Amino acid sequence: MARVIARMSALWQLWHHIMKIEGGSHYHVLQDRLPCQTIGSLQLLDAVIDDSGTLFLFFNSAVAAEAVQPPQGVHLTSCQRITGATVMRFEVSSPAKALSFVIDGSSLTLAPTSGPKTHLTDRNCLLATRNGENAAVVLDWLAFHHRHHGAQSAVILDRARPVEAPSFADALEAGIQKRGLDIHITLVSANAPLGHADLPAEADPFCVPEAPGKDRHMAGPPDVWRAPLGANIWYEIARRRFLDKARAVANIDVHDLIDPSGGSVFDRAAISPTGMIALRGRHVFPWRLRRGTKPQFGDHICVQFDSTQIRKRWCVAPGKARQATDWRMVKVSDVAPAKDHPIGFDRHMALRHDGSNIARLVPKASLIEDPALVARAADLFEHDPIRLPAPATLSPKRHGGRSVIVTTMKNEGPFILEWLAHHRAVGFKDFLVYSNDCTDGTDVLLQLLMEKGWLVHRDNPYRQMKLRPQHAALQSADDEPCVRRADWLLCADVDEFVNIKTGDGTLTALFDAAPDANVFSMTWRLFGNADRHHFVDAPVTTQFHRCAPEVTRKPHQAWGFKTLFANQGLFRKLGVHRPKGLNPQHWESVKWVNGSGAPMPRSIYRNGWRSSMATYGYDLVQLNHYAVRSAESFLVKRERGRVNHVDRDQGLSYWFRMNNNADEDRSILARISGMQAVLDQLMDDPEIAQAHAFCVDRHRSRIVQLRANPTYAAFYAQLTSPRMQALSRLHGHFGANVFLQGPGVVPDDIAACDPQGTWFFTVPPVDETSH
């Protein structure tokens, strides 16, 4: 009984299809289907024969020519690979309704479809895929391109299961007739799924290039019926089966709208010298959808201010571009687009992807309104989208004013006074210091300094907030009066020294050198231990002058930067390396420069934290980063743990990455006199001097205890070994994977190589980074 019902259903669909074709203009939607036959290990998507007797077989994988044996009178003329699929071309001497092939060892009788379809001859055609968009969206899409570009027909690959095709076709038919559209649709379904086998449904945010946190986002289960299109051979099938005699074909998707300002895209292609026009698309987004509503074209009023992504498509006039070897998603092979400017199109992302929460599709901090999209929503779609909230007014930038450093500390007692003195001399007025779990007197010294007006000290509330110490501190800092009233803000650690190399070395000199800037990236210069193994109670900046070269692309930490920024309201909160939460409506007010005063690209405005060959600069300011200091002090640092990446050990691999002794930089010594004057003032206070001495004594005592511990003694021996000293001068010769895996992967003969030589060493990648 089930077979009878299935057969009757199939016959009804066939009759429905025939009646539509024979019914002429009364019907606007024709249904068609790709056979998608499986033969052995191969899948034959379609077989098409044209009026010259050329037969095309379209396989959804790489197929060797010898795997397909044609019948007598049918001769293979070419076997072409296209995007992982195969097109075989045969000449048929005596056309027949059925042809017997042997494919992958199995006999198969083919009844090829005649193509291209005559009802599309000399028509302006849209070529698109539908993957979940509802009929209302497709109707709006058809109406737009019919009205503004003169579209007469559309061939739409419907990615839904075949059983869903009739109801969708009926909805389209009813909508076209209701709207009075003079446009005809060929709706193509397939007997087999055509998506990527290992991807979720395309609606899943995982399939959106801009989706934030994709490295943490768990993709939905594979859904080969609704996944992004994997059978990209479809475009060549569409050409041979339907469109090779069309006047012009525009290849977009049903959530794309082609810019109408330059006239009809079809006319442009038809008069183009090459017969092809390049289409270049951007992604557009809603700001938010009204509760309980489905997304529409008119909801999409936002673009990303910093996006550089371009979607490539095309419009071709087949009669003029006869030299084309094949059609693909993003190009027509062997046809150059016209030299005039490409035509733009907008891809409306919430129509194909789940738009219930726009923040899952795109970082909302990147979205700004596009006035043209707002106008189009009202004028063309008569829609009232939810607009972006009005931006807060920016505070004026002050050339000087109060500059504040926010930092976190744990057992840093011996190094506090020099760091404080240096930055006071540079021009920082306020210091907000959070401490936690100190055992060396750091917290006592900080509390004393607060009582005497040098800084503001707070206990780190990381336990109550259930955050990492540094993140808890920065989140709490937003509510502190000294932060709220600050004109300039910087998050820096006690092993980081702002080294201003212009003018008199003060913040005023830096601001004078780049008067329009309101954000400064200060790139790290990693300073090593200069082969100094023992702790000495003396300024760090006078002891350690060996460092990484200015051009140091590896390890990736080497070119990290910290950010000094004007507290104007451009950003919402502090961050470890740079402020976070850019107010995107104000992105054009951001004047971000590097350490040489050169403008930074907008691509870093939201989340960039490290320099590159195009953006590094040290001429005006750099951040001296003394991450290791002496080997003895590093023992204490390792035991203490980290305030940000608390789950990562500061072991031999960390020392290897951060201990850089290949170059020398003494530029900060020009500022020693200013630092020393403030340090003397601090040490002239007996209570401060006593608290500092206590911290130094505890630091030395802890070093003695750790060196007596067998594990730490062995670690110290490794740190101070001739091998590790040699490696600290060879970083420029190593590939990135060496730093990820640690010094143990470097053979002894490589460690003994000449630092000045022109050699290179790397290792294969691994999944786990060594710390």
What kind of region is each of these model predictions?
Residues T113-N131:
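Low-complexity, Pro/Ser/Thr- and charge-rich linker/hinge segments at domain boundaries
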Residues C125, S403-V404:
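Cell-envelope/extracellular polymer assembly enzymes that use nucleotide-activated donors
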Residues A143-Q152, A421-D430:
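Short, acidic, metal-binding catalytic loop of nucleotide-sugar glycosyltransferases
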Residues A151-Q152, G275, K429-D430, D487, ...:
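Short acidic/polar active-site loop segments enriched in Thr and Asp
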Residues D253-I258, D493-F497:
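The conserved acidic donor/metal-binding loop of glycosyltransferases
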